[in-house]
Amino acid sequence: MLVIPAVDMKNKKCVQLIQGNPDKKHVELDNPPEIAKKWVNEGAEMLHLVDLDGALDGKRVNDEFIEEIIKKSGVPVQIGGGIRSIEDAEYLVEKGAKKVIIGTIAVENPEIIKELSKRIGSEKIMVSLDAKDGKVVIKGWKEKTKYTPVQIGKILEEMGAGSILFTNVDSEGLLNGINIEPTKELVDNLKIPIVASGGVTTIDDLLKLKEIGVYGVVVGSAIYKNMINLKDAIEAVNKSN
């Protein structure tokens, strides 16, 4: 299982938001490429980049940093935030992204995944599913859909999604631990890899997620607030059977 550090960018800074709220930040640091390098030096084998300006208002102000991280980090990068068209996804793959993370547009129109998989290949498509109170939410968690994560997950898998990034919004950014059940349901019901995100605060949380069979876990606030030491976490996960 991979432990994947998050580098979330807003206005050319590295930030960690509380429950996705742009006005509530746990962390705000300069120079995202330096932060990315620090995580790789501590053993990260993959990075999770999020362009929050792209996600929140469709502006691509962090491209320069994104390209620098892709070029210089030396590890594969999965990237999301503001990918609202097939062209946006193709642009990031051309720049060297290993996976592009598609959110709202995939849930609203799963057919787009079929088209995208023809263009860039399934293995490069990661669909982001965010759930609140058992239902998938879209548009920056503002709008609740009628689907459960498993229902939409199966549709997206059929359409050609290569993996799922699953965030349990109820736990995200609150630093009070994880609820394993919704993630386990996805792992048990889908064939494609599931990457978990949201609420991880201890190495024990990571080991529980490894136990249920997730492919990777995105860690954010906990490593920025020094609740988890990344190097120790990666070692613990690699040692556990």
Swiss-Prot record:
Superkingdom classification of source: Archaea
Taxonomic lineage from the root: Archaea, Methanobacteriati, Methanobacteriota, Methanomada group, Methanococci
EC assignment: 5.3.1.16
UniProt cross-references to CDD domains, sorted A to Z: HisA (cd04732)
Pathway info: Amino-acid biosynthesis; L-histidine biosynthesis; L-histidine from 5-phospho-alpha-D-ribose 1-diphosphate: step 4/9
Protein name per Swiss-Prot or TrEMBL: 1-(5-phosphoribosyl)-5-[(5-phosphoribosylamino)methylideneamino] imidazole-4-carboxamide isomerase
Gene that encodes it: hisA
Active site: 8 (proton acceptor), 130 (proton donor)
Pfam families xref list: His_biosynth
